[in-house]
Amino acid sequence: MLKFMLDTNTCIFTIKNKPEHIRERFNLNTSRMCISSITLMELIYGAEKSLAPERNLAVVEGFISRLEVLDYDTQAAIHTGQIRAELARKGTPVGPYDQMIAGHAGSRGLVVVTNNLREFERIPGIRIEDWC
C-alpha cells in the first residue's frame, strides 16, 4: 500500500546518494513510495537540459523503474486548486509544481517526502516528512 510521494528534491538526493542515509530510507520503503507524473516531468527536464542528457535520462529511467508513477488526475487538480486558492488568500505563494505535487499527494492521502520544508510547510492540509 502506498504511503509516501517523493518530491523532486528527494528523488535527486536519492539518485545522487547524498546524504547517504536517504538511500537506506528509500530501500526500506520502496514498495510504499511513488512519485507524481509532475515529479517525473521535473526529473526529465533536468536530465534533458544537463550536459549529459543520455546518461542522465538512463539514470532517471532506472530510478523510476523501482517506483510507481501516479498520473496527475482530476482529483489532484481539484485538490491543487483548493490549495492554490488558500495560499492566495493568505498571501503565501508556493511554486506551481510544489502546489501540484502537494495537491496530488493530498488527493491520495499520501505523505510528501521533501526537504523543501520552507515551501511545503505553508501548504494547508498535507503531511510532510524530511528524510534528509
Curated annotation (Swiss-Prot):
Cofactor(s), names only, from the UniProt record: Mg(2+)
Reported effect, D7A: No inhibition of cell growth, no degradation of tRNA(fMet)
EC number in record: 3.1.-.-
PANTHER family referenced in this protein's UniProt entry, alphabetically: RIBONUCLEASE VAPC2
Name assigned to this protein: tRNA(fMet)-specific endonuclease VapC
NCBIfam families tied to this protein: PRK13725.1
Residues in PINc domain copies: 5-131
Induction: Induced by amino acid starvation and by chloramphenicol treatment.
Entry binding sites for Mg(2+): D7, D98
Gene: vapC
Database matches in SUPFAM superfamilies: PIN domain-like
GO molecular function terms attached to this record: magnesium ion binding; RNA endonuclease activity
